[in-house]
């Protein structure tokens, strides 16, 4: 896994994705990692005042009541030439008083692709010591594996480095999937680090608990002709490890727990249906594809496929709410917030609701895409005179509302790393041949001019930005709250793989 490097070059303001919910974080004053005049890192408030004095060699955002910091060992200096493999295990955890609660002798991973493991304030950190990994003299075979554990954000529990690996995409359950040295998976308690269900299941992408159940594969100790260990049918267990019986010929679906008391199941004919969390059949297997139930504008629904190109939306009892032929994609309709988009004519894209009704159609020369509504009920659309096969940076984006009215013309470049946060969209504008970043507000107006070389989403009222060799935080008016200078250009989370032609 990619290590979490906590230096001045990594400041991520990411959006929570949900997770462990039995503990909640009391609302406290937001703290932001910042570099002081002494070159060390501490934490400022929204006014730019240091509440935790600069004393660390690196710092990350607080998650709940804890943050990961770095303290380099004597003699180590991080530079652009530093090889990743030579970076020491020098990360630990502090609380909101700045007190160290886990000594900086570990390496942490928080997640990737803009997603935290289990949610920003509700998830875990993946913890290890890479220095424990020992290779042979040719560096081809490991002589000793590094051990892995977790730090639980809500409870503040550190499990210790007790396993070969863990599955960090935790759910809202108290149990974390862990993997032992025999490559079997079991479950540990997030709040104590103690084993609850012994490691006895197939360990390939182990299931988290959802709705009180998880789907697991029991290991078949018989080996096939290639010498690989097999696995039996997938079934359900509860949080004590007790198996939940399913009807004959019915198997649980791996990765799935109970969503709204519905567990996806499959029969011997490979058709999908649904049972409840007690293992009772609710919707007879009849679909060639199926999805988990989720909240939508039509209530709690799931998208299913009856036959080739024949898709529908069902409720919790299997009643068909809508059904239509959809030929444009092998995996069927992709609803987001209850809507999907479709190319309906030359230079025309339409927004459709879950009943297949057209909300609006947008006809523009060279239009190549239309997005689904964001939290502010606006949709991005993209125009590209060269067609839809060109690189993303050659497209220009605009915004349209739910009435099909264009809020801003397609004149902006939209970074693929950014979403919508606290009323602002990050956009890119070409100025004198250089890409500069700024922010649009909900009206589509340029609220903060495109003057930044790097920019992050707003989080708790501030956004991290960079201008040349200066970086720091701005408020929602674009005012500099706290900035510092650096000698070398930092690593940028905003990157472009190619130059515009």
Predicted features along the sequence, with ranges:
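Positively charged n-region of N-terminal signal peptides that target proteins for export
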Residues: 1-4
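General helical structural elements
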Residues: 6-7, 344
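Bacterial N-terminal signal peptides
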Residues: 7-16
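Residue-level detector of conserved, function-critical positions
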Residues: 22-501
């Amino acid at each position: 896994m990619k290590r979490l490097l906590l230096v001045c070059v990594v400041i991520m303001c990411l959006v929570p994705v949900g997770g462990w919910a039995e503990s909640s974080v009391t609302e406290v004053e937001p703290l932001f990692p910042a570099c002081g005049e002494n070159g060390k890192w501490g934490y400022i408030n929204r006014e730019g005042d240091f509440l935790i004095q600069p004393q660390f060699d690196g710092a990350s955002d607080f998650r709940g009541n804890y943050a990961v910091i770095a303290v380099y060992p004597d003699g180590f200096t991080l530079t652009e030439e530093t090889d990743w493999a030579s970076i020491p295990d020098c990360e630990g955890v502090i609380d909101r008083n700045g007190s160290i609660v886990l000594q900086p002798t570990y390496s942490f991973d928080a997640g990737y692709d803009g997603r935290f493991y289990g949610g920003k304030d509700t998830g875990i950190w993946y913890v290890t010591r890479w220095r424990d990994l020992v290779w042979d003299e040719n560096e081809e075979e490991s002589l000793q594996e590094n051990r892995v554990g977790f730090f639980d954000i809500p409870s503040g529990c550190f499990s210790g480095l007790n396993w070969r690996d863990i599955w960090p995409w935790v759910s809202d359950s108290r149990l974390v999937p862990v993997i032992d040295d025999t490559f079997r998976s079991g479950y540990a308690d997030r709040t104590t680090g103690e084993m609850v269900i012994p490691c006895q299941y197939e360990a390939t992408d182990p299931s988290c608990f959802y709705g009180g159940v998880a789907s697991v594969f029991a290991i078949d100790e018989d080996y096939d002709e290639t010498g690989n260990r097999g696995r039996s049918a997938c079934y359900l267990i509860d949080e004590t490890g007790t198996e939940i019986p399913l009807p004959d010929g019915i198997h649980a679906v791996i990765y799935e727990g109970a969503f709204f008391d519905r567990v996806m199941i499959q029969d011997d004919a490979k058709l999908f249906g649904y049972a409840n969390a007690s293992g009772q059949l609710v919707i007879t297997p009849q679909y060639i594809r199926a999805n988990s139930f989720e909240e939508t504008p039509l209530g709690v629904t799931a998208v299913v496929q009856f036959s080739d190109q024949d898709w529908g939306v069902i409720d919790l009892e299997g009643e068909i709410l809508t059904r239509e032929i959809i030929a444009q994609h092998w995996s069927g309709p992709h609803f987001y917030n209850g809507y999907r988009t479709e190319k309906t004519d030359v230079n025309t894209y339409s927004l459709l609701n879950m009943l297949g009704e057209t909300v609006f159609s947008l006809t523009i020369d060279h239009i190549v895409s239309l997005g689904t509504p964001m939290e502010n009920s606006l949709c991005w659309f993209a125009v590209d005179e060269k067609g839809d096969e060109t690189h993303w940076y050659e497209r220009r984006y605009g915004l349209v509302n739910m009435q099909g009215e264009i809020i801003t013309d397609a004149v902006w470049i939209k970074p693929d790393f950014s979403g919508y946060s606290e009323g602002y969209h990050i956009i890119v504008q070409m100025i004198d041949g250089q890409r500069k970043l700024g922010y649009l507000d909900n009206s589509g107006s340029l609220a903060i001019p495109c003057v930044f070389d790097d920019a992050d989403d707003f989080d708790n009222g501030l956004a991290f930005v960079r201008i040349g060799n200066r970086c720091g935080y701005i408020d929602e008016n674009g005012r500099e709250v706290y900035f510092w200078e650096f000698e070398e250009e930092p690593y940028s989370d905003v990157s472009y793989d190619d130059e515009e032609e």
